[in-house]
Amino acid sequence: DFIGPYRDIPAPDVYTNAQVMAWIVDTYSQLKGYMVPEVVTGKPIPLGGSLGRDTATGRGAVFCTREAARVRKMTLKGASFAVQGYGNAGSNYAEILQELGGKLVAAADSQGAVLSKKGIDAVKLLKHKEKVGTVVGMPGTEKISEDELLRTECDILVPAALENAITKDVAKGVRAKVIVECANGPTTPEADRVLDANGVFVVPDILANSGGVIVSYLEWVQNLNRLRWTEEEVNTKLEDKITRAFSDVHETSQKEKVSMRTAALIVGVGRVADAIKTLGLWP
């Protein structure tokens, strides 16, 4: 068994969705001879999926943005932000941050990018994309390149597409005060050093996009115990866990005088090391 509820539990990512998770549950359960909903997360609700899972990655990143704004003494009301990658995570992030007073000024997908200094309605932009297949052509915006988006003057830059979007050359032109990594590995190591030297506050992917994994864990717990939490309960648990995680990482960053990325690794590896030491040696 390569996967299993106590071995390895897949969840949706690029080019997969709840339907794909449903197929995996069905196939695995057929092989086992009984229903095993806890073998994957991000499932459709009727198959044991968790309420709030579809927005969890974006919502968790917004919670991290709120905490970053707090420690950097920024206000979210009126804060401008640009989102590179207007898929599930990026669009949910934009909609939720907009509700908190943020102003979306630029967005991109695989077809191109758009800009409007006056602001773009996040909900209308998603509807436009669903209708025509791209954010390009959104009324009231001008088309720009993806590189121009990454260099857009804004308070918050959100890479929410694929890895290595922010290279060393791109980093030199970044004008955002804060970067919140919704994507996995969007910043190269060389770019990371440039951003750090330029005083850009980076909330690393291991922390910023952990909302999806956190709610996947909550879905797994619900499945194992045959529970069903409300969306409000799930969001509250997500907020509590990711806010405490941010606090731990930021505290370590300040104490050790390292970047948030290095601090996140120190915290994570430290917890595993503590657990191993507590186990002792066997035999």
Please annotate each region the language model reported.
Residues 15-19, 23, 52, 56-63, ...:
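Conserved active-site and cofactor/substrate-binding residues in soluble primary-metabolism enzymes
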Residues 112-202:
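Rossmann-like adenosine-cofactor binding region
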Residues 41-44, 49-153:
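Glycine-rich phosphate/diphosphate-binding loop of Rossmann-like nucleotide-binding domains
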Residues 68, 172-283:
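Adenosine-phosphate binding glycine-rich loop
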